[in-house]
Each structure stands twice: as structure tokens, then as C-alpha cells.
């Protein structure tokens, strides 16, 4: 069996979690949990899992998904999507709960506290694309070279951190963009560490 894609593995983990709670979710509920645009996207994942022998589909039943085993609660995270983060020119903070998604813990290097949607292309050389959902682990501290979500004068951006002897720079990973030099009198704070991403679709 070929390895599961991250999204498909997350759907399987969600189904296992629901099965442990005695629930067989409908396609509409799966689509809502993962932010799919339609039930058809959920159907494709469910059908692929069934063909791989990881779940069973009971015919002619709205809630006809049967999961042989269980993943355990630690395998799943229910993460809030809190707004946008700029991969380009910093954008004004619009932090506020938009939705929540069930995701597999294994997708992230650190345990994320929330997700932000990327806007822009300044981090494409690090594999972070416009529209991606990035996991953010809350932290006020970061090492030189880490990818951080930072607040500069009230605006939010995702960049690589460079701590110079005299000033901090936030480095893009796209030659079309210039580094952000943090002025000495700027209102600057590290909001968190990048710990992985989800590419939907």
C-alpha cells in the first residue's frame, strides 16, 4: 500500500477518533471538520481509505463508515484557524477565530497552538505557498535562522529570523522580496514558531 498523504492520514485519524467515541460521521460532517468545499472531497478520501482496507463502508447507510482500529486521542489535534499571516509585505493583524480543523499530530514538528493562512509568496523557497495553513507554536523566543511569526508595529508576517549584532532582520525566502529590517524603536514581538503546514485541496 502506498503511503497516505498527510490530508488522508488526518481523515483516517479523525475517523478513528470518532469511532472510539462511538460515532460514525457523515460525509458532510467530515467535510465540515476539514474545511472541504463539498462532500465530494470527503467522499474521495473515504473511498481511498476503504480501497486501502483501512476502513469499511456499509452500503445504503448515511453513517456507514466502520473503522477496525483506533488511533487514540493524542494522534489528533483540534486547531483553530485564527486569521492570515503575510508572506510578503506585513498585513494588519486580523486575529480572530475563523474555524477549527481536526489534524494529525504527526504533521507538525512542534505541537501547534493555532493555524494561520498564508497570504503572499515570500517564503516559497522554504515550501510555504500562498494559501497554505501554517501551524504556529506559541513562543516569545526563537533562535537565529528559525521561521517565526512576528509582529512588527501591529502587523503580522512569517519570515526567517536573523539576529544581527545591532539589529534584527526578518528574511524572506524569495529573491523577489527584500528583508524587513526591524528598527530599534519598532514595536516588535515574536508571536510563535512555524512548525508545519497543511496544503488544502
UniProtKB/Swiss-Prot annotation:
Q: Which InterPro entries match?
A: LexA, LexA-like, LexA/Signal_pep-like_sf, LexA_DNA-bd_dom, LexA_repressor, Peptidase_S24_LexA, Peptidase_S24_S26A/B/C, WH-like_DNA-bd_sf
> Which Gene Ontology molecular function entries are recorded, alphabetically?
DNA binding; serine-type endopeptidase activity
Keyword DNA damage belongs to the record: yes
Q: What is its EC number?
A: 3.4.21.88
Q: Write down the position(s) of the site called Cleavage.
A: 87-88
Q: How does it assemble?
A: Homodimer.
Per the record, the similarity remark reads: Belongs to the peptidase S24 family.
The molecule here is called LexA repressor 1
Provenance organism: Xanthomonas oryzae pv. oryzae (strain KACC10331 / KXO85)
Amino acid at each position: 500500500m502506498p503511503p497516505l498523504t498527510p490530508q488522508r492520514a488526518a481523515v483516517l485519524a479523525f475517523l478513528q477518533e470518532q469511532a472510539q467515541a462511538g460515532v460514525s460521521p457523515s460525509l458532510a460532517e467530515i467535510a465540515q471538520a476539514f474545511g472541504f468545499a463539498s462532500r465530494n472531497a470527503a467522499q474521495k478520501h473515504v473511498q481511498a481509505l476503504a480501497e486501502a482496507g483501512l476502513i469499511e463502508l456499509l452500503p445504503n447507510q448515511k453513517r456507514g463508515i466502520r473503522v477496525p482500529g483506533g488511533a487514540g486521542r493524542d494522534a489528533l489535534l483540534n486547531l483553530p484557524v485564527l486569521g492570515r499571516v503575510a508572506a510578503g509585505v506585513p498585513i494588519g493583524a486580523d486575529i480572530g477565530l475563523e474555524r477549527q480543523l481536526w489534524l494529525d499530530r504527526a504533521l507538525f514538528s512542534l505541537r501547534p497552538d493555532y493555524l494561520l493562512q498564508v497570504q503572499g509568496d515570500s517564503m516559497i523557497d522554504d515550501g510555504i505557498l500562498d494559501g497554505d495553513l501554517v501551524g504556529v507554536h506559541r513562543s516569545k523566543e526563537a533562535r537565529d535562522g528559525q521561521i517565526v511569526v512576528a509582529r512588527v508595529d501591529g502587523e503580522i508576517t512569517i519570515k526567517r529570523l536573523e539576529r544581527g549584532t545591532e539589529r534584527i532582520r526578518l528574511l524572506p525566502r524569495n529573491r523577489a522580496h527584500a528583508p524587513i529590517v526591524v528598527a530599534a524603536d519598532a514595536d516588535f514581538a515574536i508571536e510563535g514558531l512555524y512548525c508545519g503546514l497543511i496544503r488544502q485541496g
